[in-house]
Amino acid sequence: MSLSVEAKAKILAEFGRCENDTGSSEVQVALLTAQINHLQGHFKEHIHDHHSRRGLLRMVSTRRKLLAYLKRTENVRYQELIKKLGLRR
């Protein structure tokens, strides 16, 4: 399941640099985090849904790569992002 248009717009407004910013690393990580959180709830009901689990692992991998890139290039923005999203306890 994908996010609704309203949910995506809210994430874009919160994490984007401008109103049409969909490609920055922060926005991509925030969207992936929202999708991952949504799928985690799905797997509590549908334990044997292995096809969707593969998609979840792909999203986690993509998010990890984007976070590594952001940490390497813009460490301050990386720290702010993980604090906002509640990652890396």
From Swiss-Prot:
Short name of one Pfam family: Ribosomal_S15
Keywords of this entry: Ribonucleoprotein, Ribosomal protein, RNA-binding, rRNA-binding
Keyword RNA-binding tagged: yes
Biological processes annotated in GO: translation
GO molecular function: rRNA binding; structural constituent of ribosome
Record function comment: One of the primary rRNA binding proteins, it binds directly to 16S rRNA where it helps nucleate assembly of the platform of the 30S subunit by binding and bridging several RNA helices of the 16S rRNA. Forms an intersubunit bridge (bridge B4) with the 23S rRNA of the 50S subunit in the ribosome.
Family: Belongs to the universal ribosomal protein uS15 family.
HAMAP family for this protein: Ribosomal_uS15_B
Subunit structure as annotated in this protein's UniProt entry: Part of the 30S ribosomal subunit. Forms a bridge to the 50S subunit in the 70S ribosome, contacting the 23S rRNA.
Protein name: Small ribosomal subunit protein uS15
Native source species: Shewanella piezotolerans (strain WP3 / JCM 13877)
